[in-house]
């Protein structure tokens, strides 16, 4: 088992503290770029057989909701479908975000 040193600027896993700091800064910059790019990633869901469509971006901003006029009279169903649709949309967004973040962090792992 390889010992990792972290005192006095000595090596940590084969990299100096300066190299690790630069790597961390580079990773933070890349993560911020990806975070900013999420505003350009469009995500949508359709629930109730297409009666409700919700559109958002991966930065968690809802952009539009389309509701079939027939649902406007049945507020209970409308409410249930909106909740289901928003939850499904958020799950989709989180999956996209996790996959993109994993790609970034995987490239920076020292081992």
From Swiss-Prot:
GO terms for molecular function: DNA binding. It comes from the Bacteria. Pfam families: YbaB_DNA_bd. GO terms for cellular component: bacterial nucleoid; cytosol. Keywords: Cytoplasm, DNA-binding. It is found in: Cytoplasm, Nucleoid. SUPFAM superfamilies: YbaB-like. InterPro entries: YbaB-like_sf, YbaB/EbfC. Gene3D superfamilies: Nucleoid-associated protein YbaB-like domain. Disulfide bonds: none annotated. Belongs to the YbaB/EbfC family. Binds to DNA and alters its conformation. May be involved in regulation of gene expression, nucleoid organization and DNA protection. Homodimer. This is Nucleoid-associated protein Tmel_0542. It comes from Thermosipho melanesiensis (strain DSM 12029 / CIP 104789 / BI429).
